[in-house]
Amino acid sequence: MDLYSRKIIAWTLSKTLEVDEVLKCLETAKSRRKTANPVVIQSDRGIHYTSRRYRELTRDMVCSYSRKGNPWDNACIESYHALIKREWLNRFKIMNYHQAYQLVFEYLEGFYNTVRIHSHCEYLSPNEYENKYMLEETN
């Protein structure tokens, strides 16, 4: 999640909690956000985010870790997880991985980034807020 616009930059849905999935997601995010500015990446202290492979992949970033037992340090992504459950996933009886993937895709790509407004983003969607920023930067 980009904390400026609240846009989900990259995501994955995995049947297992393997570090490879985290790394693939991070690679996708890096390819979508080519920037000369310093990148700060916030995560919890899970084994995926403290692994040697993760640290190698993020060596050109500033890694910020939440304090142990303090989910408030990751409040934005925790809030997103609550939203997707409350606004979308809890409406369905999910039968399999494919259905779960489709539902997450529909919410994220078809609603959250494109339609859902955020007070932080001046009541614009993440995409609209980013576009507004880009227009202001070019003027």
Q: Can you say where each PLM-predicted feature lies in the sequence?
A:
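Hydrophobic "anchor" residues
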Residues: 5-8, 114
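RNase H-like two-metal-ion nuclease catalytic core shared by retroviral integrases
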Residues: 43-45, 51-52, 66-85, 96, ...
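C-terminal domain-tail junction helix/linker
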Residues: 61, 83-139
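Hydrophobic "anchor" residues on beta-strands that sit immediately upstream
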Residues: 40
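Gly/Pro-enriched, hydrophobic low-complexity segments
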Residues: 1-3
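Active-site beta-loop-alpha junctions of metal-dependent nucleic acid enzymes
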Residues: 11-35
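Two-metal-ion acidic nuclease core segments, chiefly of the RNase H-like superfamily
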Residues: 55-62
